[in-house]
């Protein structure tokens, strides 16, 4: 008996069903490195329009976490998609290498008493070691880039470039020295940037403190009263008793009503609206004697509770009635608004009291509290206030308070002499940096759009930028200050260039070991060489000035403006922010055309990842157990504009999506294995109707996906690929196509037409998925191109052949698909009843009206192939009510080869188990098909 199975064109491919990703992926990475794929892509893309995604440098400290993986995978998807879209899209990874965390690591390992030059040497070595660790982990994620030549902020050329960027800002007039309150961490021993501050709950003492009036007659006049007969106190409320030794003024709102309250032994000055709450807090009875506006109390002097000095009233619009007394105590060294108020009222910088030292202790010469830690001094200060009779109430409150992001310890505002970039100082063209930056925000595209208003608000409300730090491991601020006047050397910009040249050769150590006389000659005796270093946000914030201008081999030759910066949403106050300020200061515009922000990773319940919750997922573990491809697909399938949920269950669902795509790809490869596009292609006009429809819906997918890539909406692409593989192909086109692919003659026009369509579909699918499923696309591409050292990334998105009348074709086939879906439901009901197994055991009768009838009639004899039944009869229904689809089990004979049930099985006596169609396909001229 003949084995007709061997006569079928059964699919065959070297592309395995199982991805076995954890084992196979390292091999692809090794192949890319061996082939120098990144360099090949650069060569292939030379001369195309440029697209530059400038890498925001991760900090060179510790292994990668999921946030790192998310960020780098998103960048890789964008760079790959831009390459496939026809751009020259280089990707130069970078690392942020200076700063306190690395210095802290070195101190922990080697102790705090090392010489400064040794600290810098160890920091540089540690950062280099961390870069190598992170680099390997990024490469394992399938990220393509110039990994052999990354940019590091500690590269000598970049350190020199940073000094030159600072020189540009000095030359423009933005940089000044000033005494201002800055975020200060006692553990860091340094000022902190806004981006290094986080908020957490803190329990603080809350005290109500009376300041005795030093000018009772003026106070009486303000309230329209005769001279007062007993003491009067203005009462303040504060949660920072430690600032009271530095008090130098009181603030009242000019428009608020203030009351003079008689409590028996003395008068209290309180905001009128808060009198009741205050008296209850103090356990006192009292009556309001008189009221006046805050403006009437301007400059009235009160006495410090325990020091012999005055605290005048300064008016301030920032005073509120939300809590407290309506009177604010002002310690200008330890509060931004306090500082601004006192300076606006004529207080000179030299007059501002700064008793708190950098380590958190009071200066030794401070009366009563000298040498004490400020936090430990709070109860001592409260006791002193009680002793002098000025403590009216005390309590404990829990409130949100600023903390150091590294040490998790409370911060203070502390006025120190620092270097600043001025936000509101007009420069040569009359504009301020704030104005330039706000215009820059408005000119930038944001993904998602809400990022614009967020960054705009931050720029509008931010203070001057404190760019100096008091640390060892950082790029120096190479200034010489006159020892008597404190002024910068008149040749500062010129001297900075000389320093930059030395740093270019020797690194930052060139400045720290420099003898001033080498540059200043005889003038050196008059000048002091400062030791401050630059804020690390200035490091990364100026990479557009040196990395993109060509300090790196892949410099963006068109200039320092990148097409895109992409980071987490916290970088609105970090890298996006500092880059915007430096770009606008130096070039007058942002260093980027667009900003893309992504959210943070959370677990399935929306909780942050933490070891204590046990919900941490490491990218290394996912790569080892499931494959980096699954992590890439998870990133792409999630809407990154908000929080990104991840868990074992979520990743398992991603695996199912991957399997669907892989199985579809395997079918396509298996059924085009014997097809050569150069020899076997069938012209489009000779394709069957359903093949032209498949071309049309593939074109729709390609157009939509390419548009979504351009908009960075990758989750829409993954959704579309799922629908395409599962519904358009798997449940429709490929399902119908199997009969033609397997049963017609191998070289028949009907089969070759199908294979031509499948070849175009495969090319399209592979290139659309390549930015996301990079390993799998490469694996499939190798199967398509055996023996060639080729890569899908050396090509561009597939150009599908054009065809006329596509809209009408699609509309007709959408109707056919809708009818087919209803027919399959009817057959499924028959299967559920146990009357048929496969759909080929059924016969259909379709009674349809108008458009449906016309669409199905257009299929002619091929109708049964579309419905996947052995027979399909079409009748025209008189009305919608008369429409029906009826399925019945076939009573005919099953063909051994094609499994259709027909009356002509055995028609050919030599092949008694074959239907006439199969006999003709095997031994005759072969069947003719026109539609399916």
Curated annotation (Swiss-Prot):
Its main location: cytoplasm. GO terms for biological process: isoleucyl-tRNA aminoacylation. It comes from the Bacteria. It is found in: Cytoplasm. Its cofactor is Zn(2+). A motif ('HIGH' region) lies at residues 58-68. ATP binds at residue 611. Catalyzes the attachment of isoleucine to tRNA(Ile). As IleRS can inadvertently accommodate and process structurally similar amino acids such as valine, to avoid such errors it has two additional distinct tRNA(Ile)-dependent editing activities. One activity is designated as 'pretransfer' editing and involves the hydrolysis of activated Val-AMP. The other activity is designated 'posttransfer' editing and involves deacylation of mischarged Val-tRNA(Ile). PANTHER family: ISOLEUCINE--TRNA LIGASE, MITOCHONDRIAL (PTHR42765:SF1), SOLEUCYL-TRNA SYNTHETASE (PTHR42765). This is Isoleucine--tRNA ligase.
């Amino acid at each position: 008996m003949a084995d007709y199975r061997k006569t079928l064109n059964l699919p065959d491919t070297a592309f395995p069903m199982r991805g076995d990703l954890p084992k196979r992926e390292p091999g692809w990475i090794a192949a890319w490195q061996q082939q120098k794929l990144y360099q090949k892509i650069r060569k292939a893309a030379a001369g195309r329009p440029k697209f530059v995604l400038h890498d925001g440098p991760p900090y060179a400290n510790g292994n990668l976490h999921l946030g790192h993986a998310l960020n780098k995978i998103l960048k890789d998807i964008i760079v790959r998609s831009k390459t496939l879209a026809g751009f020259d899209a280089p990707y130069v990874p970078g690392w942020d290498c200076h700063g306190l965390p690395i210095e802290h690591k070195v101190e922990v390992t080697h102790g705090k008493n090392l010489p400064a030059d040794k600290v810098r040497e160890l920091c540089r070595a540690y950062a280099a070691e961390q870069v190598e660790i992170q680099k390997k982990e990024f490469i394992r994620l399938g990220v393509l880039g110039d990994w052999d030549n990354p940019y590091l902020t500690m590269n000598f050329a970049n350190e020199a470039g940073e000094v030159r960027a600072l020189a540009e800002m000095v030359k423009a007039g933005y940089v000044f020295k000033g005494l201002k309150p800055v975020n200060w961490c006692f553990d860091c021993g340094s000022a902190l940037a806004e981006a290094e501050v986080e908020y957490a709950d803190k329990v603080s003492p809350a005290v109500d403190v009376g300041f005795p009036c030093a000018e009772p007659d003026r106070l009486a006049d303000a309230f329209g009263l005769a001279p007062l007969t007993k003491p009067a106190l203005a009462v303040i409320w504060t949660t920072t008793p430690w600032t009271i030794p530095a008090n130098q003024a009181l603030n009242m709102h000019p428009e608020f009503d203030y009351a003079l309250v008689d409590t028996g032994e003395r008068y209290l000055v309180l905001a009128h609206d808060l009198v009741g709450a205050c008296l209850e807090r103090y356990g006192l009875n009292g009556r309001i004697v008189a009221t006046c506006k805050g403006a009437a109390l301007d400059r009235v002097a009160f006495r410090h509770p325990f020091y012999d000095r005055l605290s005048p009233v300064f008016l301030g619009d920032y005073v509120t009635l939300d809590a407290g007394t309506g009177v604010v105590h002002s310690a200008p060294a330890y509060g931004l608004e306090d500082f601004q108020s006192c300076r606006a009222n004529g207080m000179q910088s030299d007059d501002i009291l700064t008793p708190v030292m950098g380590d958190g202790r009071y200066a030794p010469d401070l009366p009563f509290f000298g040498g004490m830690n400020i936090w430990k001094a709070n109860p001592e200060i409260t006791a002193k206030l009680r002793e002098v009779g000025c403590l009216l109430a005390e309590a404990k409150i829990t409130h949100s308070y600023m903390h150091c992001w590294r040490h998790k310890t409370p911060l203070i505002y502390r006025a120190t002499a620092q270097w600043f970039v001025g936000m509101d100082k007009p420069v040569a063209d009359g504009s301020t940096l704030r104005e330039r930056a706000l215009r820059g925000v408005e000119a930038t595209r944001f993904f998602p759009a809400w990022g614009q208003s967020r960054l705009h608000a931050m720029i509008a409300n931010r203070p001057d930028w404190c760019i100096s730090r008091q640390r060892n491991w950082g790029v120096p601020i190479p200034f010489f200050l006159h020892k008597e006047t404190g002024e910068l050397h008149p040749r500062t910009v010129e001297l900075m260039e000389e320093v930059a040249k030395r740093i270019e050769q020797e690194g930052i150590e060139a400045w720290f070991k420099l003898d001033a006389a080498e540059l200043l000659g005889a003038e050196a005796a008059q000048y002091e060489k400062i030791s401050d270093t630059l804020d690390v946000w200035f490091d990364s914030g100026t990479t557009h000035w040196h990395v993109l201008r060509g300090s790196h081999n892949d410099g963006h030759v068109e200039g320092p403006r990148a097409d895109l910066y992409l980071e987490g949403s916290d970088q609105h106050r970090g890298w996006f922010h500092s880059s915007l300020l430096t770009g606008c200061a130096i070039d007058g515009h942002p260093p980027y055309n667009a900003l893309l922000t992504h959210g943070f990773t959370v677990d399935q319940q929306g909780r942050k990842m933490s070891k204590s919750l046990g919900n941490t997922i490491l990218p290394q573990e996912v790569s080892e157990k499931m494959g980096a491809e699954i992590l890439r697909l998870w990133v792409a399938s999630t809407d990154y504009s908000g929080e990104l949920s991840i868990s074992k269950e979520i990743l398992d669902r991603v695996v199912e999506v991957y399997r669907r795509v892989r199985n579809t790809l395997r079918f396509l490869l298996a059924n085009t294995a014997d097809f050569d596009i150069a020899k076997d292609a069938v012209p489009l006009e000779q394709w069957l109707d359903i093949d032209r429809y498949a071309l049309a819906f593939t074109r729709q997918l390609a157009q939509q996906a390419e548009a979504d890539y351009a908009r960075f909406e990758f989750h829409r692409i993954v959704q579309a690929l799922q629908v395409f593989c599962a519904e358009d192909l798997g449940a429709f086109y490929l399902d119908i196509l199997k009969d033609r692919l397997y049963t017609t003659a191998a070289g028949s026009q009907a089969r070759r037409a199908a294979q031509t369509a499948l070849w175009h579909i495969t090319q399209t699918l592979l290139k659309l998925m390549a930015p996301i499923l990079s390993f799998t696309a490469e694996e499939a591409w190798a199967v398509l191109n055996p023996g060639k050292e080729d890569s899908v990334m050396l090509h561009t998105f597939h150009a599908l052949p054009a065809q006329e009348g596509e809209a009408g074709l699609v509309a007709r086939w959408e109707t056919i698909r809708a009818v087919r879906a209803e027919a399959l439901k009817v057959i499924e009901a028959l299967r559920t009843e146990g009357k048929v197994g496969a759909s080929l055991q059924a016969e259909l009768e379709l009674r349809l009206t108008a458009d449906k009838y016309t669409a199905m009639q257009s299929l002619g004899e091929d109708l049964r192939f579309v419905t996947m039944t052995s027979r399909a009869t079409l009748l025209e229904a008189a009305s919608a009510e008369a429409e029906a689809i009826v399925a019945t089990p076939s009573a005919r004979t099953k063909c051994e080869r094609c499994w259709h049930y027909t009356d002509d099985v055995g028609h050919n006596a030599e092949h008694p188990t074959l239907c006439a169609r199969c006999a003709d396909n095997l031994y005759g001229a072969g069947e003719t098909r026109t539609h399916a």
